[in-house]
Amino acid sequence: MTDTEVLRKDNRYELRVDGKVAGLAAFLDHDNQRVFHHTEINRAHRGEGLSTVLIEAALTDTVGAGMRIVPVCPAVKAYLEKENGFAESVDPVTDEIFDWLEAKFQKR
């Protein structure tokens, strides 16, 4: 059995397996919304169900912080389509959100 933990660091949640980074869920906060725009699991750990562990922990932390979830990332969106426990905390992805994200990334 592998030891996993999910930690929030800056604008991402890191999934650690046996103390090493194995994946991340990246986000940017927009007012009271946490906009998830990218999720990634390292190749060595794909197919182990770790994206579910990562996304569930990230969404639980988001809701616990009083933030709304905006699932731009396809992996987060797919998770939410299967798991309805977060339905009341999800905001739709709008053109305004896409424009805001684009502007944020152009500044980097």
List where the protein language model places each region.
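A short, internal acetyl-CoA/4′-phosphopantetheine-binding micro-motif in the GNAT/acyltransferase core
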Residues: 40-46
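Terminal substrate-recognition subdomain of acyl/acetyltransferases
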Residues: 2-24, 33, 60-108
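A conserved beta-turn-beta hairpin within the catalytic core of GNAT-like acetyltransferases
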Residues: 29-37
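Generic alpha-helix structural propensity
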Residues: 36, 50-53, 71
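Conserved GNAT-family N-acetyltransferase fold
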Residues: 25, 39
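Conserved acetyl-CoA-binding loop-helix of GNAT-fold acetyltransferases
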Residues: 47-59
